[in-house]
Amino acid sequence: MDPKLLDILVCPLCKSPLLYRKPENELICKADRLAFPIRDGIPIMLEDEARRLPVEEEISR
């Protein structure tokens, strides 16, 4: 994932910064506990495509 792109992408719902999880190939919004997938190098920033993170799943930087 391009670091410059990561600097400008925010959560489409709350506008919070996103964390990049390389192993899962996801962008994480801590505030909304959503994981947005990255497919073929393209972040899919749609709420319907995001995975809800369970409360027990730790979100770390």
From Swiss-Prot:
Pfam families: Trm112p
Coiled coil: none
Signal peptide limits: none
Any single GO CC term annotated in Swiss-Prot or TrEMBL for this entry: cytosol
Domain of life: Bacteria
Gene3D superfamilies per the UniProt record, alphabetical: 2.20.25.10
Family: Belongs to the UPF0434 family.
Xref: PANTHER family: PROTEIN PREY, MITOCHONDRIAL, ZGC:162634
Name of the featured protein: UPF0434 protein Nmul_A1027
